[in-house]
């Protein structure tokens, strides 16, 4: 079953930055994985902890992460951020 993706305003802006940085194809690969199964491994994902508990993260590259929330009952993935968490 295909999962629906919803993008936050920040994630939409991040996608433009990633395209400009030459990371669009890697990001699209990860988004396709999320559409198929957001808990598929590989590629590996991390469950976030602390204030971000309930969220998941996947590496786009060494610096950038795709951060998302899963709504199992709705088969929905909220894509929250896709840019560096170091800024």
Name each model-derived stretch.
Residues 32-58:
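A short, surface-exposed loop/turn module that caps and links secondary-structure elements
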């Amino acid at each position: 079953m295909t999962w629906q993706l919803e993008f936050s305003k920040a994630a939409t802006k991040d996608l433009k930055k990633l395209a400009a940085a030459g990371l669009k194809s890697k990001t699209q690969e990860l988004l396709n994985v999320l559409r198929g199964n957001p808990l598929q491994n590989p590629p590996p994902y991390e469950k976030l902890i602390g204030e971000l508990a309930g969220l998941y993260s996947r590496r786009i590259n060494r610096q950038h992460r795709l951060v998302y929330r899963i709504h199992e009952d709705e088969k929905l993935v909220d894509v929250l951020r896709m840019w560096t968490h170091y800024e």
